[in-house]
């Protein structure tokens, strides 16, 4: 039985099928910048034969592809053999636009790995990835034992696309307004480190905290991240001639290895656990627990999964499955804490978003 013999009113099959076809053609048009070749002047069109010459493409193939996009309403055909833009296709005329970047991104980084889910699950069972180096993305890319970032190092073009899309789609996640850091200001006379920003990048969040709480001494704070990132942070501090930021200690290392700063008051970990499977998160939190004092705290700043997430959040959570990451609920953070010698002492939520701070204390 072909798909055309099924009554579309009694089955969602056609909706799924047509979406697959449309997405596949759209990706081709984006890759070959075909949307940019169609005139954007209202009422203007272009002969398909002109496109075939410009693209050195098969006339038969291009006709078949455009036939579907016309039928689906992505393109229009004001006269036989011509195509023109619609409001849908006009969104993709700029290859650097958010729409164009994100479409290609979800195709390459969600759809392609998702197509391989059956094979991945047949090999690993119906289980979440237990390691960032054993993921659906790696399985689909032909690197079943490498992490996303290790794989991207072998794909410069794909890596550039990934980074461009992340930059275009990045929505700032609040650092302040949820948790009251003022108690840390009272530690100014102590010798211990006040804040260790674990996996803190170039220190964007730590800078915000120090700016809002001037009683926290910068010299009592540590930025901890991998070598390359710390080098960039040091260079940035020198370039900006920021004396306050220069006094913050910057220590390179891996959060999977021993935490070099012992007994800090706070180990701040923001937008990190979100990217890793449970077992890797357990390792990260255990390394901190091994370094902690009896009264140390961990502040996990992340987007917190609701018990009944929205469609968009549920989709994002499954997108992260491809790389081994996941969104977590309060209960999930509690389970991680219990496994690593911590306990949840409080959850402080942002009123405008799903962002929150989960405070852990030694169990």
Curated annotation (Swiss-Prot):
Transmembrane segments: none annotated. Its EC number is 2.1.1.-. GO terms for molecular function: O-methyltransferase activity. S-adenosyl-L-methionine binds at residues 199-200, 225, 254-255, 270-271. It comes from the Eukaryota. The keyword Methyltransferase applies. Pathway: Secondary metabolite biosynthesis. One of its GO terms (biological process) is secondary metabolite biosynthetic process. Disruption phenotype: Leads to a small accumulation of pyranonigrin J and the formation of a desmethylated product pyranonigrin K. Keywords: Methyltransferase, S-adenosyl-L-methionine, Transferase. Induction: Expression is positively regulated by the cluster-specific transcription factor pynR. InterPro entries: COMT-like, O_MeTrfase_dom, SAM-dependent_MTases_sf, WH-like_DNA-bd_sf, WH_DNA-bd_sf. PANTHER family: O-METHYLTRANSFERASE ELCB, PUTATIVE (AFU_ORTHOLOGUE AFUA_4G14580)-RELATED. Belongs to the class I-like SAM-binding methyltransferase superfamily. Cation-independent O-methyltransferase family. Methyltransferase; part of the gene cluster that mediates the biosynthesis of pyranonigrins, a family of antioxidative compounds. The first step of pyranonigrins biosynthesis is performed by the hybrid PKS-NRPS synthetase that condenses 6 malonyl-CoA units to an acetyl starter unit, to form a 1,3,5-trioxotetradecane-6,8-dienyl-ACP. The enoyl reductase (ER) domain of pynA is likely to be functional during the first two rounds of polyketide chain extension, to generate the saturated C-C bonds of the alkyl side chain. PynA subsequently forms the amide bond between the acyl chain and L-serine. This is Methyltransferase pynC.
């Amino acid at each position: 039985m072909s798909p055309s013999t099924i009554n579309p009113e009694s089955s969602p099959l056609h909706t799924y099928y047509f979406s697959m076809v449309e997405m596949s053609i759209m990706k081709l048009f984006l890759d070959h910048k075909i949307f940019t070749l169609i005139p954007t002047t209202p009422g203007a069109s272009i002969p398909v034969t002109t496109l075939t010459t410009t693209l050195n493409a098969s006339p038969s193939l291009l006709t078949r592809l455009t036939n579907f996009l016309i039928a689906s309403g992505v393109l229009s055909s004001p006269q036989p053999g011509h195509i023109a833009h619609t409001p849908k296709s006009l969104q993709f005329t700029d290859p650097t636009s958010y729409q164009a970047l994100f479409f290609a991104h979800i195709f390459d980084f969600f759809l392609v790995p998702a197509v391989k889910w059956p094979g991945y699950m047949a090999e690993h069972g119906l289980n979440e990835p237990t390691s960032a180096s054993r993921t659906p993305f790696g399985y689909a890319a032909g690197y079943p034992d490498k992490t996303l970032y290790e794989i991207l190092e072998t794909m410069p073009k794909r890596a550039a696309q990934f980074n461009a899309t992340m930059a275009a789609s990045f929505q700032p996640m609040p650092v302040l307004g949820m948790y009251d850091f003022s108690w840390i200001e009272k530690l100014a006379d102590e010798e211990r480190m006040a804040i260790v920003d674990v996996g803190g990048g170039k220190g964007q969040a730590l800078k915000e905290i120090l700016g809002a709480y001037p009683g926290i001494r910068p010299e009592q704070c540590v930025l901890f991240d991998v070598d390359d990132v710390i080098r960039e942070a040091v260079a940035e501090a020198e370039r900006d001639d920021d004396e306050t930021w220069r006094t913050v200690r910057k220590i390179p290392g891996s959060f999977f290895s021993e935490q070099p700063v012992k007994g800090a008051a706070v180990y701040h970990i923001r937008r990190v656990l979100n990217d890793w499977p449970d077992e890797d998160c357990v390792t990260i939190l255990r390394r901190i627990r091994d370094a902690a004092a009896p009264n140390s705290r961990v502040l996990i700043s992340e987007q917190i999964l609701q018990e009944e997430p929205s469609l968009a959040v549920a989709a994002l959570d499954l997108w992260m499955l491809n790389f081994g990451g996941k969104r977590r609920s309060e209960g999930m953070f509690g389970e991680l804490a219990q496994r690593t010698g911590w306990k949840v002492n409080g959850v402080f939520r942002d009123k405008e978003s799903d962002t929150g701070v989960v405070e852990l204390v030694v169990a």
